[in-house]
Amino acid sequence: MLELKNISFHASAGDSKREILKNINLKIDERFVAFTGPNGGGKSTLAKVIAGIITPSEGEIFLDGENITALSVTERAKRGISFAFQQPVRFKGITVKDLITLASGKKIGISEACSFLSEVGLCARDYINREVDSSLSGGELKRIEIATILARSTGLSIFDEPEAGIDLWSFGNLIAVFENMYKKINGSILIISHQERILSIA
């Protein structure tokens, strides 16, 4: 279970501070949680605070009873928190197969790696040996990143606006991926989205 106690975050803006989050108290023990709302509401900031990418100005974060407030993003990842960025990172020199294998944390075969790609709507044979570089579109990178999260199968998987950059892949297929993930993993899924239709998974 994830618990946030009195979480606040202030961003510096010149000589002043802008309050992004204020006294957030939240418990997440459900299988699926979605934060929806307009731009600038602090949704992505809250997700990054949970993942350890941003340090809160005030408050504490607990994961399964352990205070993880001071832990780095790497340490939180080791404890079972995955984070999928709104704009996925490119890795020149690393193939899609390599990336999925690294994400899984174990040696996996081609067929298993391909199965993760198929689950996110990619033709595995066209992508498995490609480099994760600028030759891939934003939508392709997004789907590959979701495949790595599926491979990790962590206790808490956070997706920051997963629909961003997906042009040719329908939103309905994206929802189908999360529905499948919801059935397969034992952990919780936290999605940040502008699309209220994502709530249909819950």
PLM-predicted stretches and their roles:
Residues 161-162, 169:
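Walker B catalytic motif
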Residues 51:
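Helix-to-loop junction immediately C-terminal to a conserved catalytic motif
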Residues 59-66, 79, 112:
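Conserved ABC transporter NBD signature motif
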Residues 67-82:
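ABC ATPase NBD coupling module
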Residues 2, 19-23:
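Conserved structural motif at the start of ABC-family nucleotide-binding domains
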Residues 36-39:
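The feature captures the beta-strand-to-loop junction immediately N-terminal to the Walker
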Residues 149-150:
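ABC ATPase C-loop
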